[in-house]
Amino acid sequence: MHEHKAELRLITVALNEASTDSPSFRASVNYFHTRMESLSSWMHSTVDYVENTYKPSFQDFQRIKETLFSQLLPSPILLSNGFVSNQPYTPLLVRDFTRDVSDLSNTVMKIILGDENSQYTAALSALSSDAINPYFNKRKTFEYYQRKYDSFLTDFLAATNDGNTLIPQNLQNETFKLVDIKHKYIEASLDLTEAISLMKVNLDKFLIETIDIVRKNNVITTKDTKDVIDITPELTETLKDWTDWIESNLQTLQALSSKLSEAKYAILKLSLARMKPSRLIQDYDLKSIQNLKFNLPKSISNGNNSEEKGLSGWLYMKTTVGHDPKRVVWVRRWCFLQNNVFGVFSLSPSKTYVEETDKFGILWITVEYLPKEPRNFCFKLRIQNPNCKTEEENTYIDIILQAESIDELKSWINTLTSHKRIALSIKEENDPRYQLARKKIEPQFFEFASSSSTSTDKLLTSFSSKTLTLVEELKKNYMSEDDIYSIIDNKAYHLRVISTPIATQLTHLALFSTFLSVSNYYPCATQANTWGTANWNDLSYLVNPLKGSSVHKPATVSNSSRFSVSYPDYYPYSLKVDDIQFRSIFFSVNHDFLQVPKELVLLRYSSVWCPNNKQKFASMAFVTLNHIYVYLNISGFSYLRRIDLLDIDSIEYDKSPKHVSSRMLHMQRGDGLRFNMSVFFTDRRAVASKLQFLIENKAMHIPKGEKEVLEIFQELDEEIENEKKIIKDNLSESEHYSKDYDYLLKSTYDHHFENTNETPMELMSRKLRLEREAWCYFQDNFKVGSKTLFHVLFGDKSQVFPSSLFLCKKGSNLNNNSYWERIRRAKEDASCQFELCRKLQFQLNRTSNFIKDLLWLKDDNDNFKLVLQQRVTKIKQGYYFEVEEGPIIVKFPLCHPLLLRVRFIIAECITSQGESLKKCDLAILYDFNYVESIDKLNTKVEKLWLFERIHLNWALRYCKLEHSEINRKTREYLKKFNDREKMSDVIKLCGFLGVLPKERIENDEKAGDFMQPVYINYDFLSLSKIFTKLTVFYLSSVIIKTMKVLLAMVMVIFKCFSKVNKTLYYCLLISAVTNLFFVGKSIHSYFSVKSAETLFQNYANGDQRGLQIMHRSLTVPDLNLLTRKMMDNDQENPVFKRFDEDKNAYQYKGTRQEIAIKRNQVLTELKILQNTEKELVQGSYRKFIITERDKCITTQNEIFDLWINDTKLQDYCMACFAEYNRLSAIPV
C-alpha cells in the first residue's frame, strides 16, 4: 500500500476577496479590527491592573498572612523550658505546624493568584510583541493606503466633464496614478489577511500558554511521599488536546507559509494584469463614445447565443439623502450580474457586515450610456417593476451608476447587453435560465436587507410575504430562543460554531440562515457573509465541476429551500445544530445540488487531516450514513471534500502508546491510497468504532437506518464513559496525573473484535508452540491482511465452510452455517474475555459421491446431517485470529475411537517495529488421538496396532485433500477482488462476522463443553466403499498420468515443428518424399539381383558340387546368336523336324521336356543378367554417349570445314547419334 502524493488544490477565499476589495473583505477586516481593539484594550487594562493593583495588594496580603500565621499559636520558644507537659515534642509540633500551614497557604495562593515570577505578564508581553503589534502595524499600513485609494478615487470620479478632464492625456495620467495606488492598496490588503490568520493562531497559542501557567500551579507534590496530585484533571486532559492541536496548527502554518507567499504573489500578479491600463491615447478619448448607443439588436442570431460569464465590482450610485431639501450624493455599491440576475451589495452602517437589496432578472433591465451626465463613465439602468404591466412613470426605477474607468464602463454595458440578448434568445419558457431572467428576488431575511437611508437604496429594497424574520423561523423548528440570541450577540461558543472563510458581525447568523435560503444560483448576503462574493462552485470538490460554462443549469428554479429538512423526533438537538452548520458550509457554495442530499449528520469531530505524505491541515469532519465530509479553513485557505465510505477499506487507530500518535486514525482506500486523521477533543477509539461500523453497515445487504445507528452510537458513548469512570476509580490520585488512563480504554469495537490482551509477539510464540504440538499442520501465505482473510474464511456469506470439509457432501441443501454467538465466561481469565461460537451443518458423505448410496445398504450415518461447531478463541484486531473446530470422534472397525481436533490460525506478517506488511499466514493444525472410549476422551491410547496406524495414514491423506480444498476456495474468493484488498468488497462477497446481539454468560465448565463432539461410525461396508474408491482412483490416476506424459511429448514435438520456418518445412518435406522414391527403386533393384544370384548359386552348388568349374563370359551378342541358332535348329531344320515326328523319338520326349524347362530357366536368368549389365553400364555409358554427342554437335556447327572433309568423323558421330537414340528408347 502506498500513500497519496498529489497535493490538494486549496481555495484561497480570503486572499481572493482581498484582491478584489469586495464588501465581504472590508466587512470582515473591519469586524476583526473591532475585536482586536477590544482585545488590545483588555490586554492593557489587565497588564495595568496586574502591575499597579494586584502586585502591591498581593505583597501586602502576603505580609499580613505571614503575621497571622506566626501569631496563630504561641511561639515554640515560649513553650520550651518546662512550660508544657510534653516538653520533647510539643514545641516541635507547633514549629512544624506553623511552617506547614505557611507552605500550604503559599501553595493555595499560588493556585488562585499565580506566582511572583510574573509569567502571566510575560505571556501577555509575548502576545503583544509577536502577534498584536505586527497586526496593528499591518493594519496601520492598510488604513493608510485604503484612505489614500478611496480619497483619490472619489476625487478622480467626482471631476465634472469640463475641457481639462476630457483631455485623453489627463485621463491617462490620472488612471495610471489610480492603478499605482490601487496596487499598493491590494498588496497591503493581502498582507493584512496574512497577519489576521497568524494573529488567530497566536491568540490560541497565548491562551494555551496562559492556562498552562495557571494549571501548573494546580499540580501539588506531597512533601513526604512525593505523590503528585492534580486538582483539575479534566482541565489537564483538555489542555493536552489544545496543546497538541495548536502544535499541529503551527506546523501546518509553517508548511503553508511558502504556499501563502506564493499565493499572495500569484494573486497580486493576476490583479495587476487584470487592472493594467491601456497605453494607447485613443482609448481615453471620451468623445469617441459620446454618440455610442448600446441598444439591444432587433434580430438575434443563434450564432451569437453563447454563454457569458458574470461580472461584479464596485460602482458609484447616484442617490439623494434628506427630505427638504434633498441632497445628491454618490455612494459606493458592489454590483453583480450572475446567472442572468443583477443585484447590489452594500456595507452595513457599522461597516462590519454585508447587506443586500432586491435582485432583478436581466429581462427587466435596460441599459443606456449617459454621455451628458456631469460626471464621467456614467450609465443608466432602467428596471421595470415586474408587478406592473403598463409603461407609466412609476412602473420602473432609474439607477445612474458610474464606473471607475472607461474599460469598466464598456465591460458593464456590453455584459448587460449580451446577457439580455442571450436571455431573449431562449425559446423555452420553462428553461431555468429564462425563469431566473424574469424573476424579481426580494431579500429573504429582514436581518440582511439593506438598512441604508438613501432614496435609491430604499427603492431597490422591498419586502414581500416571502421575506422572513430569521430569528422567528429558527425559533419555530430548529433552535432554542437562548441559543438564537446568543448567536445574535456572538456568544454562541457553547454551540461549537465552526469558523467560516469570511467572518463578519453576522456570520454566525448567516451560517444558520443559509439552511433556510431558497437558492444560491446567484449571490446573496448570507453567502457574502460566510463565503464572500466570489463564485466557488467549480472548486467545491463535492462533485465534478461544471465544464464549459459558469452558468448553472438546474432542472427547475424552486421557490422552496433546497436545504430544508424535517428533523425526526429521535434526532438529538446537539446534532441538529451541527447538521445546520454542515449543510450551510458544504452546500451553500455548491450549485450542483438542486436539492441537498437528505443525509443527517451522525458524528462530528475535529481532526488534523493528512490527505497525503506532504500536507496536513486542521479540519472539521462531518459524518453521515454514507459519506465523510471534510472541511478545512486555515491561514486564508479553504477546502471541501466528500469521501464515500465505500471507498474506504478499513479504519484503524494507531496502536502506539505515545499520546500524539494515539490520536491517529489510519484510513485506507480501495485503490491502495492511505490517509490519516488525528482526532482531537473526542475519544478517537469511539470515532474509529463508529466509522468502521458505518463502513460495514453500508456494505450490508440491508443496512441499518439513521435511528438504529444513533442508538448504537449512544450505547457506545455510554459504555466508554462508564469504562472511563471505572478506570479512574481504580487509579490512585498520583496515577491520574502520571498515567495516560485513556490509553487503557477499550471501545466497544475492540470488545466485539478483540478478546485478548496478549501482544503480537506473545501470540506469535503461541502459534509456534501449537504448531510443534500438532500432529500435522499446513501453512499458506496470502497477500492480504489478516482481517480480510478472516472475513473470507468465516464471514456469514462465505461458502468456504462447510463445503471445503472433506466429510461434507458437496451441493447438499443441508449445508449451511449459523451466526456467531458471543459467549462470556462467568469467570474471565486474563488472556481471553469472551469467545465467538457458531455451528456448521452439513450432510455426511464418506465417499464423495463416487459410489451412490442407493447401491449399498445404508447404516446410521448415511445421508445423516452433522452439526460441527467452530469457536473463535483468540482475536487480536489486525494481527492474530485463532479458530478451533471440532472435536470429531471417528470409529473404525477393530480400532479405538479416533479424536480429531482442527485449529485455524491467521497471523499477520509484521516487521520488527510492529508494522504490518499486508500479508498473512494461514496455518491449519490437525491433532489426532486414539482414546480408550467415547466416555474417556482424556485417556490417550499409546500403543497402536497395524489397522490403527493404517487409518492414521489415511487420515493424513484426507487432511491434505481438505487443506487443498480450503486453499483453493480461499484463493478463488481473493481473485474476485482483483488484487485489491477493499474491505467493503470483502464484506459484500463474504459477509460480516454476524454476531448475535445478545450475549450468553456461561460458567467455565459449560463454556468449555459448548462444542459437543461429533460422532461418526465407519463399518466394514463403508470401508469397502472407500477401498473401492481408492483402487479406482489409483488406476485412473496412473492412466491419466501416462496419457499426460504422451500428450506432453506430442505437444513438445508439435511445438518444435511449429517454430520451424514454413518454407524450410515444405522443402524438407519434398526432399524427404523424393529420397523415399529413389530409395524404393534402389531396394527393388538390389533384391532382384540378390534373388538371381542366389538362384544361380543354389543351382551351381546343387548340381556341380565337387567338380572343377570353368567360367566363361558370355556377351550379349553371343547370347543373341546362341538363342537364334537354337531356335533355327528346332524350328527350321527339316531333318530334325522329321526325326521329331518319328515314333522312336517319343522315348526322348521326357528328357527333352526337362531340358526345355532348364533352357527356359537359363534364358530367364540370362535375360535378368542382361538387364543387370545394362543397369550397371547404362549410367556411365549414357554420360559418355551424351558427351560425345555434344562434341559432335559442336564440331558440326562450329568447325564445319573439318566436318565436311573428315568422313570417319561423320561416321563416328552418326554412330553416336544412333546409339544415343537407342539408349533413349530403352525404358529406365
Curated annotation (Swiss-Prot):
Give the top-rank taxon of the lineage listed in the UniProt record for this protein.
Answer: Eukaryota
Segments traversing the membrane: 1063-1083
Glycosylation sites (chain numbering):
N1205
Gene Ontology cellular component terms for the protein in this record? cortical endoplasmic reticulum; cytosol; endoplasmic reticulum; endoplasmic reticulum membrane; mitochondrial membrane; mitochondrion; plasma membrane
User: Pfam families, per this entry?
Assistant: PH
Member of which family?
A: Belongs to the SIP3 family.
What is the name listed in the Swiss-Prot or TrEMBL entry for this protein?
Answer: Membrane-anchored lipid-binding protein LAM1
Source organism of this protein record:
Saccharomyces cerevisiae (strain ATCC 204508 / S288c) (Baker's yeast)
> Gene that codes for this?
LAM1
